[in-house]
Amino acid sequence: MLVSAAEMLKKAKAGHYAVGQFNINNMEWTKAALLTAEECKSPIILGVSEGAGKYMCGFKTVADMVKAMMEELNITVPVALHLDHGTYDGCYKCIKAGFSSIMFDGSHYPIEENVEKTKELAGVCKGLRLSLEAEVGSIGGEEDGVVGMGECADPKECKMIADLGVDMLAAGIGNIHGKYPENWGGLRFDVLDDIQKLTGEMPLVLHGGTGIPADMIKKAIDLGVSKINVNTECQLSFAEATRKYIEAGKDNEGKGYDPRKLLKPGFDAICDTIKEKMELFGSVGKAFE
């Protein structure tokens, strides 16, 4: 059974750890994430971008697949199925499809319109007991064709959005999607601290978790980050393991071309990456606390 992310993030906030959101892109990704969470006894948030949802034949297909896999694999840890960087229309599609959590990315709207739409969605989600994530200040890099410059959020605007009844808040603090450039200036902990002071107990979300040094991750958690998103790192791990398999000629050995064998190294690499992140975030063993 899927659950809202609200309760798991409240526990993470109180326990000074973070829950990982690991984006899924197909069956292998989903299975790897679920099995690793169960092995680690960690709560998990499965993220689905609108592009990934379209690739997997629609949000209902994704929701039905996740629910069926949880039942078949006997998954007992808390699992939230979360729309990542959702448009206004996309949020309603995911609500209808059976997602348990959504993110409305209104960061590209003027703050007044962001407030209006977020407030509306907060009311809808509260009535359905779904969790809602909002964003202030665009996250750098590219996500499904939307390019953000990575500016820092205004703490006062964060307070404005947090007071609308959302369950978690993503705020730009110099983080970006994808690989970080060599000249990246690092996370703005001063901005994060100001945001935390104004938003109180609100769980904060760190997007672009790939490539951020471990010490920065731990400091961000200390300053109130309770959810960390990881996508690119799993993709890179999958690609590298698959490349090695093919370059070693394994696909030409016996029935090594069978997709179930061909995709296995990449699957294992995703599992290893997720486990490594759960250990870093401190969520291992926290599923039933």
Predicted feature residues:
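Short catalytic-loop micro-motif centered on adjacent basic/acidic residues
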Residues: V19-N23, L81-H82, M103, L204-H207, ...
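A general structural-boundary detector
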Residues: G20, G145-G148, E182, H207, ...
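Metal-dependent phosphohydrolase cores
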Residues: Q21, T199, P213, P259
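Active-site proximal loops enriched in glycine and acidic residues that flank catalytic Cys/His/Asp
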Residues: I173, G208-T210, T232
